[in-house]
């Protein structure tokens, strides 16, 4: 038998040992996968961003407070508030942190003369500074971007006719601009531009709410309806014309809202503060009637999001 030198034997043994260790390092035993492990649960979708859009309508705007009370009583809190004209007043106060009952208390205690700083007619009978000061005092002089809720206020550029959205800056000034009915309030001058009532171009600013990222939009329409009775004079004819024009614009925007709330306030006078309590009551009624539709829209949102997550 051939004798293998001892050194060669030791070298062979070392080589075999190295290869064996290398095999252990590069080829670990396969992991055992249980067939009973459940599929990973998808992350729940984020809650929908709910926007409350408050339209214009002068003294009928008190109905917005009733709608807010109804929504609050059933746990609905909007993430985004958008207001135009009278709706901007309520939207600003609500965005500042006032609840529905607090808004009602403020509404019933306010006096019309507090907003009526009459002046010699030049380009309007009312300056609007009193309204601006009232709002700023009520919100603690906070600018729009520092309010409790996201707020957007719509006005109209008097020179270009463009829709302008205030998302920052002086809250009272924005509300004043949005509420400056041409011929009644003086136009609001700001940054070398002049602004008037937002209801001229967007009586119920649904599109603005969608642009701000709202998933579910609740729009409150308090616009006047055309009168079916005989129009007595020139003023009646002019007002009827404006009502028809505003109604057409409002209908186009409302078509893109998820929930439309329309309080029964046709019998109330837009210029009469004395009917404010009745307006609030009618707003509450309409808000309650809209709750089921709102719940359905929120459920549909979650259903769509969950279906999207499964596909991904």
Which residue ranges define each predicted feature?
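Patatin-like phospholipase
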Residues: 2, 13, 24-81, 93-312
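Alpha-helical transmembrane segments
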Residues: 8-15
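Gly/Ala-rich beta-loop-alpha elbow adjacent to hydrolase catalytic centers
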Residues: 83, 87
């Amino acid at each position: 038998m051939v004798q293998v030198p001892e050194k060669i034997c030791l070298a062979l043994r070392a080589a075999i040992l190295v290869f064996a260790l290398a095999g252990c390092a590069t080829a670990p035993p396969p992991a055992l996968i249980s067939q009973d492990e459940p599929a990973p649960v998808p992350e729940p979708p984020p809650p929908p961003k709910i926007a409350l859009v408050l339209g214009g309508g002068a003294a009928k705007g008190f109905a917005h407070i009733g709608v807010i009370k109804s929504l609050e009583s059933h746990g609905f809190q909007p993430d985004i508030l958008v207001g135009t004209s009278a709706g901007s007043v309520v939207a600003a106060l609500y965005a500042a942190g006032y609840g529905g009952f607090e808004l009602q208390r403020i509404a019933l205690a306010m006096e019309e003369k507090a907003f009526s700083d009459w002046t010699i007619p030049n380009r309007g009978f009312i300056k609007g500074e009193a309204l601006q000061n009232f709002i700023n005092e009520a919100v603690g002089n906070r600018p729009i971007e520092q309010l409790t809720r996201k707020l957007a206020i719509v006005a109209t550029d008097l020179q270009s006719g463009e829709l302008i959205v205030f998302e920052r800056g002086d809250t009272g000034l924005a509300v004043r601009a949005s509420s400056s009915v041409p011929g009644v309030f003086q136009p609001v001058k700001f940054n070398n531009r002049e602004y008037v009532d937002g209801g001229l171009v967007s009586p119920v600013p649904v599109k603005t709410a969608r642009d701000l990222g709202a998933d579910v939009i609740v729009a409150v329409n308090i616009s006047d309806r055309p009168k079916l009775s005989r129009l007595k004079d020139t003023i009646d004819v002019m007002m009827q014309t404006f009502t028809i024009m505003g109604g057409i614009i409002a209908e186009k925007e409302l078509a893109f809202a998820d929930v439309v709330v329309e309080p029964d306030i046709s019998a109330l006078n837009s210029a009469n503060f004395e009917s404010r309590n009745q307006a609030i009551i009618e707003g509450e009624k309409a808000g309650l009637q809209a709750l089921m539709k709102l719940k359905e829209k929120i459920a549909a949102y979650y259903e769509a999001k969950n279906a999207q997550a499964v596909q991904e």
